[in-house]
């Protein structure tokens, strides 16, 4: 393959070939980075224009199994349904490129990104966007800006730009941002929870007295404070702008001549506009008071029909655009000029919140979280390691297990639409992934699997953030330990020139007519996840900083309400499985297990629990169907550990010891020696005379003198002394 351009970037290089392959496409770019090879193509349907007010853009990111020397698993040996990673990558590319298209562009456009070869250390999401942007830039569409992506990691406090996958795996931060040479367009960020060693923790006397990190370690979310995040974004933004300027300079000689594509006319009918403003301004304002999307749409539709009756010659589609424009003008003007929103709230005001936990008696845990006209029923189910979701990405060496899942469902009835419930849509997958990224850093699920399902019962904006809040409450309603209290809030913005207003807890109307969709999740002290999409072409870091701090205030308000609701949680003890973790001094492990596992079996049977002990650091995991059983088992184990250890006796052949008859069997009796070790007194060694029945001579609980006759491994043979 002949490469036209080689670009050296921070921690990586990229080679591009244009015009060698996929020549029938409107634009194509062949990208090689390391051993990764990606082809991105852009194709436009020049014969059709979609008249509706949206951009008919479709992005498909497709991974080929042969790229990693693999054959697809399962019954069918070919690539079929897109994986979650492929779908999420398609969404990232779509959201980054969509703002570039000219206003009024209505031609159906397909961007296809195919991975033909893969390097195990390559960041495929970054390369996918870079390849797609290159294909779009050199195409014959009137787009003159390059978009690219940068990922940022943090290891031991040090920032790494464009990390390898190995570095990203060790990082406490995963920040992905895209933009042009002038503006940020999209941000995705998450913190990654981990173990923090605190040498100031007091050591439990029952634990190993040595300062083992496993014993004094605590789980932390690594949430990122707002000031630190702004500093990181500033560094990444600088490199992003430089990189895009370089791309544009190097790609421009390969750009095709712009095709004279027809765009939708976006100039409004002045006659209609004047008439609607003069005669129906108050009707539109009244419709805006209908907060539900279905009610608002019905009111505007009825207004349209009312006008058409008297203005039969008018085109209804044009009238719809005019009414929509006046509505948008009203919403934005009221916010910018009066600093009041359509529902009467102040710019930073949060809608009323109500929280009910464990509303489903047979579920392990649940929460009904309502904020304004947005309502999420979040249900939690606990399982073991075998319940984890198995998956294998193209860059993985083998099968991976996902033990924390968040599934988001958005049925049509939640917005008053008569539509059947079908398969999972891209938006549902994306919202579930955002909620997962928000909550995953605060839980440590060793040996457990947790599935959260969010059923959106009503939606008027911010349903993904309701999922985060409801998801946290469901975790607490299941008595799962968390390192932070996490809430989510959706921020918005309306701007006109230098004038702007930042909105907290946006509803659907403000999302639709605003310039920014910015979702932020975290604790009172920092951010665990965020997702930002710009609709106006870019955002400055100063405005972003203001939005982050306003979001922090909103989160604190929501967290206060959630913490009050936590006090009233009543657990579903009848169905809720329980797990407890604690540490013991590893030297006591033998006492807990007992000879041939006798002691631990007795604990398991008595308290109906499962017990797992790490022999290296003494970590004990107790799992059972009831919390009371788990607690009783823990207390029993701690009782064994707290009992002073008897000095270990070195038994020698010929030694005489006192022992207790523990159990009588047909072939003899088991005798408990002074340090708790059992030895076998065979029937032939009980007397010089023939013994027909052991119980004729010995009684259980009787104390006798015995002689050590023989050692065989851990087995001790005894005789009557």
From Swiss-Prot:
Domain KH: 577-637
Major location (coarse): cytoplasm
UniProt record, GO biological process: mRNA catabolic process; RNA processing
Cofactors, names only: Mg(2+)
Gene Ontology MF terms: 3'-5'-RNA exonuclease activity; magnesium ion binding; polyribonucleotide nucleotidyltransferase activity; RNA binding
Keyword Magnesium: yes
Family of this protein: Belongs to the polyribonucleotide nucleotidyltransferase family.
Entry protein name: Polyribonucleotide nucleotidyltransferase
